[in-house]
Amino acid sequence: MYNELTKGDIEKMKEEIAERRSRTAALREEVRRTREFGDLSENDEYRSAKREFNKNNGRIRYLENMINTAKIIEVESTADAVGLFDFVTIYYPEDEETRVIRLVTTLRNDVLSDCISKDSPFGRAVLGAKVGDTVRVEVREGYSYPVTIQKIEKGQDDDSLPIAKY
């Protein structure tokens, strides 16, 4: 399966890879330096330095894999339908609540900031919907809930959305 990402996503990942690669030598040196502190079984500094070094290298591999397996998508939508990076005011009739979400790529998903992946059940339900449409969010087999699109404010792929950490 390929991750559908924008050119902006790819650029952000390349920037992070470059930044992390610039830190690799210093992290490697820290591992070497702390290794000299003595018995490795009781050397917390060494374990911490090694963990940071491995975390950095793991993130580089993860980002490179994401880039290598990405399918580049264009950010386009019609003026009256929900598209990628749009701000959408959603009404939940069952709870009588309103919420504003932003539809984003999987790499920029951040539920706590109301940035919802277009590939999530919620994202799939609202993508392409128009103001006034009531769509059903299929959470799992046998359970779904309705949401109504109240307002669409067109957004764009800007630098305000960081890529997600893992």
Annotated model-derived regions:
Residues 157-161:
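Short A/G/S/P-biased low-complexity tracts
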Residues 162-166:
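Short solvent-exposed strand/turn elements
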Residues 1-71:
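N-terminal intrinsically disordered, low-complexity, charge/repeat-rich segments that act as generic
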Residues 73-156:
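Non-DNA-binding regulatory cores of transcription-related proteins
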